[in-house]
Amino acid sequence: LGIQVNAAKALNQAFATSASSILLDKATISYTAALPEIPASDDGVLYLFEMQPYEYAVAPTAVPVASAPASLTPAFTVPYTGTRLYTKLGLAVKSGGQNVLIANPQYIANPELLATHTKARQARPLKSEQGKEFCNLYMSENANGVISGRYTTAQIMNNGGNQAITNPYSRAAIMPTDTHPVAPQHYMLNASEPAGITAIASELSRVAANSTIENFIVGNEVNVRTWNYMIWTDWDSYIREYMQTFRVAYNAIRSQNANARVFVCIDQNWDRNRPAGHAEYYEYIDGKDFLEKFNAMVAAEGNIDWGVAQHPYPVPLTYAKFWDMSGCPSGGYMAAQVSSGKMMTFQNLSLLTNYLQTPQMLSPTGAVRHVILSEIGLTNAQGVEVQAAALYASYVAAKSNPYVEEIIYLLSYSEPQVDTRLSGQSQLVYNSLGTAQEAVYDAWAKAFIGISDWSQVIK
């Protein structure tokens, strides 16, 4: 999966102690590396190869873009072309007639230097709403880059209708071979074939240049196969395929608007540690594990400023009275999943933001990565007052966490047990958020829940 040729013997991409690829200007790419010693080779020469996102080894017949006598600090400059925005540069030696990579291939890590449509970021309230400030961006439906409405956040989606932009391991023809089938709702995008890369890059470049969107979310709850379908392989391969798409999307977007932000999206499953063999092991990977693997893969090929979009729904979605689970089937189990940190809701958002403060998860500048809560709806199934109190609590959770930049409410969902539409008290509470009336409903919500301080229910 993703590997197009067989790796040579003793392939060691970790040989180099560092490597990077950056734009010096709009015409020149600088590639540098640091080696611990001169590598053994057939000819004493270092070769630089251009590689596609889906290539993880270099064919013996590949033609290098540059070469130089071996040294401890090799440095190359190569011309920038539009296609090199989406390819990697790999450092290799000849060994036994094979091209052996001695460093992790590197993408251009500063695509924003190319941006010609950079826009100042808009002042954003903490609270926003799906359908008003947020839209789903279905690929191949916006090929001209024109989006009606003045949205600021878009979630990039693939409904599977266009097989060219759908990952080869997500297409209808291969689904019967899935050893652990799920019911797909959306599909992995295709950064494993040239045509898919070109289509994705072209469309997202136009949208980034021509729309008001400044936050782009690549996929919906991508730690769950239902929402980003690919046949079962293993989680490392799955995340690698997603990472390839994310890179293409990131460079397409940031090379147009340097102030745009690009996010990976996870759901509530945080640290459940389902073992192999458990049915759920094949359905989702914990958000924490997904981010750890994704971050390592991205950093190895040139760290970039990705962010996290999380969906902090209550657990379960069908029950909004989170402070009293006595009326919820399996309420004790559900409450324990949250209190133990296995599931993440607005009650325990610090799980995510504390994790993102660890050294290995910081952005290239050393900052904590951008965090938005891109979808949450509170059911009215337990009554509008319960819905109103839970709604206010979710807002307080976002407001009190210094790393959460936005919470985006889904207010139009209407299924029998998960109806997030507002009325009466819940509408009044929602309207107050971010206004002078907010304090009035703060007191009401605490009294309704039966607490004196929000720290009693929000961590």
Residue ranges and their predicted role:
Residues A103-Q106, H117-R124, R171-H180, I217, ...:
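Aromatic-rich peripheral "rim/lid" segments of glycoside hydrolase catalytic domains that contact
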Residues S30-T32, Q52-P64, P69-V218, V222-S237, ...:
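N-terminal substrate-binding region of glycoside hydrolase catalytic domains
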Residues K26-A40:
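Aromatic/hydrophobic beta-strand junction motif of beta-rich domains
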Residues L1-D25:
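Short, compositionally biased P/S/T/A/G/V-rich stretches that sit at domain boundaries
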Residues I38-M51:
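Solvent-exposed loop/turn segments flanking beta-strands in beta-repeat/beta-sandwich domains
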Residues V207, F216, E221, A249, ...:
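Conserved, mostly hydrophobic/aromatic
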Residues I239-E385:
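Noncatalytic carbohydrate-binding groove/subsite architecture in carbohydrate-active enzymes
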